[in-house]
Swiss-Prot record:
Lineage per the UniProt record: Bacteria, Pseudomonadati, Thermodesulfobacteriota, Desulfobulbia, Desulfobulbales
Entry protein name: Large ribosomal subunit protein bL17
The entry's keywords: Ribonucleoprotein, Ribosomal protein
Family: Belongs to the bacterial ribosomal protein bL17 family.
UniProt keyword annotation of Ribosomal protein present: yes
Amino acid sequence: MRHRYSGRKLGRTSSHRDAMFRNMVTSLFEHERIVTTKEKAKELRPIAEKMITLGKRGDLHARRQALSYVRCAGVVHKLFGEIAEQFADRKGGYTRIIQTGVRRGDNASMAIIELVGYDETVAAATTEA
């Protein structure tokens, strides 16, 4: 019986899963929005929320914990600066998952996972400038 086994294997080894989620959480904080499969987005959400909570704590130990997981020091700086300020008054629910349909090649359910304050017009203006 499979009772009380949480988490999905996603057809990968445990080390591959860990590496994939580290890359995905780094990309999420860097771009504030990523497109992935619905299952990966659902597994990524609690990891991202814990990282944002570390950013809101803001002490040295929390920064080192985030650096041990997130792959880029610049992204950690953004997490502890911009993103932590953005969610300072929010208790949780920092990310949003939007289902977008299916992928053409293999019919996989696709979703967008984004930070709650994400605004497309602001993101487009920052990439153009």
